[in-house]
Amino acid sequence: MSGDTCLTAVCPASGAKPKTYSFKGGCLGNKYIRLNVGGCLYYTTVQVLTRHDTMLKAMFSGRMEVLTDKEGWILIDRCGKHFGSILNYLRDDTITLPKSRHEVKELMAEAKYYLIQGLVDKCQAALQDKNDTYEAVCNIPIITSPKEEEKLIESSAKPVVKLLYNRSNNKYSYTSNSDDNLLKNIELFDKLSLRFNGRVLFIKDVIGDEICCWSFYGQGRKLAEVCCTSIVYATEKKQTKVEFPEARIYEETLNVLLYETPRVPDNSLLEATSRTRSQASHSEDDEGFELRDRVRRIHVKRYSTYDDRQLGHQSAYRD
C-alpha cells in the first residue's frame, strides 16, 4: 500500500462523544495516520499533510496541538464531505472540481479554513467561469412515454401546459390552411413558454395519438383540453383540418396560473375553473366524484360538406 494513498471515507456508527487526549503532532513521524474529520474517517501520511504550507502542515509538524480519541483517531472538527478532494490536491496539486456551483463553494470554504491558497484560487476561477457561462433559463421536456408524462405532471409543483403535435397521425390530406395553423400553435407554445417559464411547466408530446391538442393541468390533475383538429368534407372526400383557437388557448393558460399555490385541496378553485355545474341535484358523494373527474374539453370541430350543411354544425361522424 503506497504511502500517498487515501482510503475511501466511511462514517462510523453514531454513539457517545469520544474522549479526547492532548497529542503533539511532532512525534508522528513519516507514517500513516488516521483522521476523523467530522465523523468521516481517512487514512493518509504526514508527508501528504505537510507537503504544502497550510494549517494541516502546522498541525502535523508539531507547531499546533492535535487531539485524538482513545482509539488513536486524530480529530478535526470540520465537515468531512470534501476532505478527500483536499487530500487529492495536497498529494499532486490537481483536483477535479464538482460540477455543482454550490459544492464548489463548499470546497472553497474548506480550503480557506485549511489555508490552502492554491485550491482557493482554483475554486474562485471555476466560480468565475460559471458566472460567465449563460445557462438555459427555459427548458422544455419532450415526452418519450406515457409513464414519463405522468411522473412529470405528478411531481411538478407548477401548473402544466402540454402541447401534443404529431402529423404522422393523419389519415387524410390536410386542408389548405392546416399546415399554417399547426405552425401557429407551435409558435404560440414557444411564446408562452418564454413568457411564463418560471411559473408554468411547459412540455411537448410528439408521440401521442392526436395531431394537435393542448392540455392544461393544475395540482396534478387535468383541467382542460383544447383539441385543434377535426374531419371536414369537401368534394366528397375527407380532409383533416387543423385550427388555431388562440383566444381559447390564452384563456386556459391564464386559468392554470390560479394553481401556482401549494398543492392543497381547494374545491372552490377547482369549481371556479371548471365548467358550470349541472343544476340537477346530486348527492355529496356524486358531487365530489364529478369534481375530481371533470375536465373541460374544448374540441374545435367544424363540419362542412359540399351540400348545404353550415359551417359549425356539430354532427357526429362514423368511419
From Swiss-Prot:
List, alphabetically, the SMART domains matched: BTB (SM00225)
Q: List, for all copies, the residue spans of the domain called BTB.
A: 31-99
Its GO biological process annotations read:
cell migration; immune response; negative regulation of Rho protein signal transduction; proteasome-mediated ubiquitin-dependent protein catabolic process; protein homooligomerization; protein ubiquitination; stress fiber assembly
Cystines in this chain? none
Biological or metabolic pathway of the protein: Protein modification; protein ubiquitination
- Tell me a Gene Ontology molecular-function term this record carries: small GTPase binding
Alphabetically sorted, this entry's keywords are: Cytoplasm, Endosome, Nucleus, Ubl conjugation pathway
Report if keyword Repeat is assigned: no
Q: Coiled-coil ranges per the record?
A: none
Looking at the record's lineage, which domain of life comes first? Answer: Eukaryota
Cellular compartment(s): Cytoplasm; Nucleus; Endosome
What single Pfam family name could you report for this chain, choosing any that match? BTB_2
Q: Which GO terms describe its cellular component?
A: Cul3-RING ubiquitin ligase complex; cytoplasm; endosome; nucleus
* Similarity annotation: Belongs to the BACURD family.
Oligomeric and partner information:
Component of the BCR(TNFAIP1) E3 ubiquitin ligase complex, at least composed of cul3, tnfaip1/bacurd2 and rbx1.
Question: What function does this protein fulfil?
Answer: Substrate-specific adapter of a BCR (BTB-CUL3-RBX1) E3 ubiquitin-protein ligase complex involved in regulation of cytoskeleton structure. The BCR(TNFAIP1) E3 ubiquitin ligase complex mediates the ubiquitination of target proteins, leading to their degradation by the proteasome.
Name of this chain's protein? BTB/POZ domain-containing adapter for CUL3-mediated RhoA degradation protein 2
